[in-house]
Regions:
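Flexible "arm" and connector segments at domain edges
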Residues: 1-103
């Protein structure tokens, strides 16, 4: 998969893929908002419609992940280092929650 990801980002260029990432993050946010609105207003037309909203969220998450993986591979970043930093940030946020912080 790494070779394919590098081929894509080298073809379109880093700047283009950065803009694409921004677009895909926006689409993910929009998909989540639509899901929440439908759930809160019960305007989904039934449970099967909620499943469609969830599937759309999954698709948008995949789009964002693909672009993040392209950028990670482009810069030859160490994935275990990213995982370690993510774990530290998660732990820090859990501490904030324990301390009653809301940010």
């Amino acid at each position: 998969m790494k070779e394919k990801l590098l081929k894509i980002i080298k073809h379109y260029g880093l700047n283009h893929q950065q803009r694409k990432l921004e677009e895909e993050v926006y689409e993910l946010q929009e998909a989540i908002t639509r899901y929440e609105m439908a759930r809160e207003t019960n305007s989904t037309g039934g449970i099967y419609s909620l499943v469609a909203f969830e599937e759309h969220i999954v698709e948008e998450i995949a789009d964002v992940c693909v672009l993040l993986m392209q950028i990670t591979d482009y810069f030859k970043l160490d994935v275990p280092s990213i995982d370690k930093i993510m774990e530290m940030k998660i732990d820090r946020q859990i501490e904030r929650i324990k301390n009653g912080e809301h940010n």
